[in-house]
Amino acid sequence: MIKKHFKKITEHFSLVKISAILVGVVCGLRVYCSLNNKGAANLNFSQDEFFFKPTVAQIAHESRVSKPMSHFFDEANTGNSNEERKVMFLSPINPATSSASPKKFKWVNTISIGPSLSLNQNSVSSSVNTSPAREKISEIREKVKEFGEELASNDLVPTQEDVRGWEDLGNRYLEYLELKLKPQLEQHNLAGFQFVNYGNLAERAKDMLANNTLCGLKVVKTNGESKLISISQFNKIFTILGENQLELEHHTISTLQDVRLMAQGVQQKQAVAMRLEPTLQNLLTTLRNQISNFEKTENWTIEPSFKNLMVYTAPSPFRLQGSMCCHLGEKSLSLGVGETTFTQFSESNPHFGLITGWNFGPKFSFGQETGLVSFSGYGIHAFCGLGFRI
């Protein structure tokens, strides 16, 4: 039900518009509160919940243990010192547990560090955790570069037999990719890929070693047409086919297989193959896990988090507050509207205490290879932690 209503809202309003509306409402409340400087009596809230009137005895007690009460009186309310002055107290949280220091209406900001528990509706892209694969790929790219330099330094060129084996393995690998990406290929009227020969062996090897890539690729369209393209456009093709990081990583594996096959026809084939095999297998395992995760459908998940920096802001008498929760461990950010409770540790220090609360809103992921922030779902977030009230 929540998902259905959320989709209806997003059909008419973009997330940017929704965020702008929320910001406008909060800013409007803040301006309204700032204009009501004459005290809390102008606000239509229950006095039993937010206010209390200190007695003369309490005022006298306060004057002995803290600042003179006259410091908090309205300048317009002057008269006999024995006259009972009417002072309204506004408590942001709970008057019974507050420090009983009369204050005017003000904006309350709190910062907290602590754990959270979220019930999230994740998008498909957020279910793919590519961090381990990216680390492996970065490591393997360095190895590929090292192998390429080693082969180039010895003026090693693959034989015709090596090239045929390389093309056979390459085509079988592309068939595997086509199987996984078949729906995306059909959307772009592509039937598949095929390796092609061009130039002599020396030029092929030189091009491959210089660019650390394959040398030629033919794109076959569903209408029977085919076009020869440079393998340097390989990543661009996959970027068009899918808007996720998974496809961008196939090129690296192809390159590794090519280097390994080239090494089979040279003097150092055993040493190179032995060094490459474990790393290649690890990457293939990671890739299979990624594909498995990517094929999962959208679902509700409960996600605990223990590395959070939470910021809440709201006018003091309002229970509904805007909040931001930065999940440092998961590299994500939750924004929402909800309720927050601040319980101070002692009456003498009203700024430190325990913060608990909840909010509902979108969740964004950041820190990806692109460096951009992307929408990764929405949900209900509950949190608690040690807090500081400004």
Curated annotation (Swiss-Prot):
GO cellular component: chloroplast
Main location (coarse class): plastid
Source taxon at top rank: Eukaryota
Keywords annotated in UniProt: Chloroplast, Plastid
Record localization: Plastid, Chloroplast
Protein name, per record: Uncharacterized 43.6 kDa protein in ycf4-trnK intergenic region
Source organism per UniProt: Chlorella vulgaris (Green alga)
Lineage: Eukaryota, Viridiplantae, Chlorophyta, core chlorophytes, Trebouxiophyceae
